[in-house]
Curated annotation (Swiss-Prot):
The keyword Protein biosynthesis applies. GO terms for cellular component: cytoplasm. Keywords: Cytoplasm, Protein biosynthesis. InterPro entries: Ribosome_recyc_fac (IPR002661), Ribosome_recyc_fac_dom (IPR023584), RRF_sf (IPR036191). Gene3D superfamilies: 3.30.1360.40, Ribosome-recycling factor (1.10.132.20). HAMAP family: RRF. This is Ribosome-recycling factor.
Length: 183
């Protein structure tokens, strides 16, 4: 049987993973600035293997509106270009022979609102994940043998404090991303 400290530590660890997954989801949302993270989920058909783009090329940002993709093997140039075109990012890669340039257009107000809406959905998913972890932790607290009613209440209050802390972190990360998008 677990004790209170291990339940709290386990809950924090799982909630940290939920926050990391949330931040990872947000990193692929396009803001007003060029960010290599927006290409993170692009998979390239590289000699018959499906490879993440960052494993076949380097991605740099020479200025706030441009991404430059330099494949380590020139044979990957066309598959990278195709993968970017086929993605749902709406990007238009420009193949220069040994590198690919992507000029990011200014975001329209409508597109910014859509991005904020997506970020809000990711935030809600993260809050739900944190609340589910709270429920699991509360169930674990009730299973601990040899605890009196006061100790159980204290354990539940501690779990709630941890939950409140992580929900606040979700909100903080969301607000920061919202400012980036609208900024």
């Amino acid at each position: 049987m677990a004790d209170m400290k291990s339940i709290q530590a386990d809950t924090r660890e799982k909630m940290n993973k939920a926050i990391e997954a949330f931040e990872n989801n947000l990193s692929v949302l396009r803001t007003g600035r060029a960010n290599p993270g927006i290409l993170k989920k692009i998979v390239v058909d590289y000699y018959g293997s499906q490879m993440p783009i960052d494993q076949v090329a380097s991605i740099t940002t020479p200025d706030p509106r441009t991404l430059v993709i330099t494949p380590w093997d020139r044979g990957a140039l066309n598959p990278i270009e195709k993968a970017i075109r086929d993605s749902d990012l709406g990007l238009n890669p420009n193949n220069k022979g040994d590198t690919i340039f992507i000029s990011l257009p200014m975001l329209t107000e409508e597109r910014r609102k859509d991005l904020v809406k997506n970020a809000k959905n990711y935030a809600e998913d993260a809050r739900i994940a944190v609340r589910n972890l709270r429920k699991h932790a509360l169930d674990e607290v009730k299973k601990v043998e040899g605890l009196g009613e006061d100790e159980i209440k204290r354990g539940e209050a501690d779990v709630q404090k941890i939950t409140d802390e992580y929900v606040a972190r979700v909100e903080s990360v969301f607000q920061k991303k919202e400012q980036e998008i609208l900024g």
